Amino acid sequence: MVYDFDGDGKAEIACKTADGTKDAANTIIGNPNADYRNSNGYILDGPEYLTVFNGQTGEAMATTNYLPPRGNVSAWGDSYGNRVDRFIAAVAYLDGQRPSFITGRGYYTRLVRVAWDWRNGTLKHRWTF
């Protein structure tokens, strides 16, 4: 998502990240040496993050665990990782005044949506549905 989430006139970037993600300041998120690919090339294990980047500089400003967590891959409707790796994102004015962003995971069998606020340099989980 690229949007001005805090109303300062400059867009932030909010996206799913993983171990080894490097920002514009060469700061690495998580473990730079991790490789969670299975024999088929799928990543069905390991940490996932949500990171907010400064849209002007590309530097990470906040990182938290991605919600909802992957958990049991089969609970999403298949066992090979297709449905657990279906993602969506949207902007919503949940308070009627300021933008929040929605992240989502899942397809068909199980859908989960999560709302986040970026306020005063802080990433806050609003709700999970």
Regions picked out by a protein language model, each given a short descriptive name:
Residues M1-F129:
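Beta-propeller-forming repeat regions
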